Each structure stands twice: as structure tokens, then as C-alpha cells.
Amino acid sequence: MSDLDKWVLHGDEMRRPLLVNPKLGESSKLVIVGGGLSGLCCAYRIAKKRPDVEVIIHEQSSLLGGVISTWKEDDWICDVAVNASRPHPAFWRLINDLELGEILKPSKSDAKSRWILLDGKQHKLSWRTLFKIGPMKLLRSIKKARMGELSVAQVIPNKQIADAMCLGIVNETSENVDADFLFPSLTKFGQNPPVKKSKLNKLISKSYPIFTPKKGTIASLEGGMQTLVDTLSEQISNLDNVTVFYGNSADSPSAIATTYDVPLESVIWAAPNPDIDQDSSKISIFAIGYTEQQVSHIKKGYGTLIPDVEFPISGILHESDVHASQRCSKGHRLFRLMVPHNRWDNDLNSVQECAESLLATNPIIFKKIGERQIPHYKPGHMSKLSQISLDCSYVGWSYSGVSITHVIDQSERIAELF
């Protein structure tokens, strides 16, 4: 496969380090530690491509799927973790191969607007946002960022806007987030494509199965993202060369290699690295719903980011505005609230009071639907990945990032080695 072909398949994911032992592709038997989305995708891609390779999934819990889950109550539907995918052909290819194309829907055309709450006022993100940041300051910061290992705060010279962007993606403020990790194309991290960006984008656009997404849209699955991991789990269970073992912890890659009698290079570690001290933050997710009349004053859009630490809520996502598939009954609207634990006193009332002040009083439903733990990606994260000893291979959220496209594309790149 040519370098250009790889870039058409994977796009800017090619900039991210692939933490794979060079002998992995020679394995006749391999063990994947972790049955979350990353582990499931790796197992599916490798097992389908190489029916002669024995694939074992070692999952410490009693269920596959990891952090991906969808909350449902009556007609209300809300994803607890990832709720959609940005345009990337790897996600489209997986959905197509799983025969889920009929339930993959682009986001609604009237829900593109995004806002940031700045000094108590909603600011719509647009080209005008550049003037709040300062175009010349931004240009100088971007040039400086190409030296590597800078924080997002050092690249985006407006703390509130930089914090909002980071909180919306990794639940952390901008001084603690690696700019190379969040904007590898902007900082020119890693290798560059062999053709101009405009030409590459045209080639990538032509490669989508199912439908070609429009610029600025996202896509989601009818019924929520749990459908994806449920379908992966079901299809993997029907593959003769895949076995899943549940309920046992995994102390280290070497211990797993001994347990399953495989060489260390045949272990894929799809879990946090036990040898790396990677901090994390916790966030609670709430669903809140109203009649359309109650929130008629709330403009339709994608959502609002809130960098101000005086608010327990860091983001409000307009779930029913964005998704083309039903998220609530007709005549209602559903919102998802993101509540970082370092901004919250653990009192449910404080979240509801804040939400009501920002949306409307007397919601029809208000419920905490889950908690999640998000790894930190501190400045220098991407550079440090290249220093990891690759006695085995590493995949997943802890390395690539929290976007669903990262881990799905990562599994394709690994399967190419077989």
C-alpha cells in the first residue's frame, strides 16, 4: 500500500503514533486485554481478515463494551459516553461492514450552531471568534506550537475559549492539555501527507461508503451508540477464531502472556498502561428534558460550553436537536449535562438549579445517568508515546484520545499488519 493510499484511508490519524510491536503481525495466537470499543474493533478486524489467527479477548468485567452505553427511560434516549462520530471514513467503513448503514444518520441541518458562555453571555462560535482570540496572536502561537510539547493554552491565546474547547473534549482546562494531541494537524505533529491538504480531502471524501458527510456535520446511530458495541459483540461471538474470557483482572502484559502461553509481542493491551502514571478526571452525566414550549427560547443547535468554574456544568448538549433519530417523544427536547467533579459539590440540587437557570424551570425529567473517568493528556503526551517500550502493543483511549474515530481507525491500522 502506498503512502498516499494510507493517508486516504486514515487521514490525520496517520499523525498519531501507532504503538505496535513489529512482530505482532506474525502472531498465530494473540490476546487482547480489554473488551471495550478498542479491543472489540481490534478483535473484529483481525479475526475477520485472518480466520487462521486465534484471537482471545481478556475482559475483567462481566460485559463487553467498556465505557460505551446508552441510557433509556420511556421515550428518552441519551448516550452516557460517546454520542456521535465526526466525519471519518474508518467509522463509516465499520458501520458498513457491520451492516448498520440503515441506522447511521447525519446530524440535523438546523443544529450546527455552537456557543460558549463568556462572562455570562452566549457567544456563537464562528469566524468572528478569531477576533476574540486575536488573529495575529493566534498565528504567532501556531508557529510556536510547531516546536512541540506545548499546552493548548499556549496555542490558543484566549484562556476562556481554550478552556471551553478542552473541557468539551477531555474534561480538562487548556493549560493541562497537549496541543499536539488535540490539534496534530495544526501543530504539524508527526508525518505530513504526500499531497496538499485540499487534494487529500477530496480523495478522502470520495472514499466514504453509505453516504458522504457534509462539512460541519456529525453522525450517530438510531438507538444510541450502545448499538455499535452490542453489534460488535454479537458478530464477534459468531466468529470461530475468537474466544472471550470474563471476570479476571490483568496485572501486566507479561502476566497475561504467561497465562495464555503466548509471546509478549502477541499481547494487545487495550487498557490503561500499568507502567505509566497517567492521571484522570471524573465527570458525571445528566439528562434533562422539557416540552418544546418550556424551552422555546433556547435556540436549536449543538450545544453550549461553559468554561466558568462558578458553574457546576461545563457543557450542555442539545441531544434532540442534533440527532436525526428520536431521542425523546414528539413535542419535547432533551439536553445532556456534563458535570466535572472538580467543579461540583456532589449535590444533585446544585446541578438542577444551575441547569434551570440556563434552560428552564420544572423539567419533565432530570436524572444522573452515569459517571465516566477521562485520562489526562498533559503537554508532551504525544511525544512521550514514542518513548513507550513496545514489548507488546498498546491501543485505546489512554493513548489515542477520547474520540471514537481514533480507536476505530487505530484498529484498522493494526489489522493492516496481518
Question: What residue ranges belong to the model's regions?
Answer:
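Glycine-rich active-site loop/strand segments that organize a redox cofactor
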Residues: 6-7, 66-91, 136, 141-142, ...
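Mobile amphipathic helical/loop "lid" adjacent to a hydrophobic cofactor/ligand pocket
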Residues: 87-198
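Helical element adjacent to the flavin cofactor pocket in flavoenzyme catalytic cores
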Residues: 194-254, 262
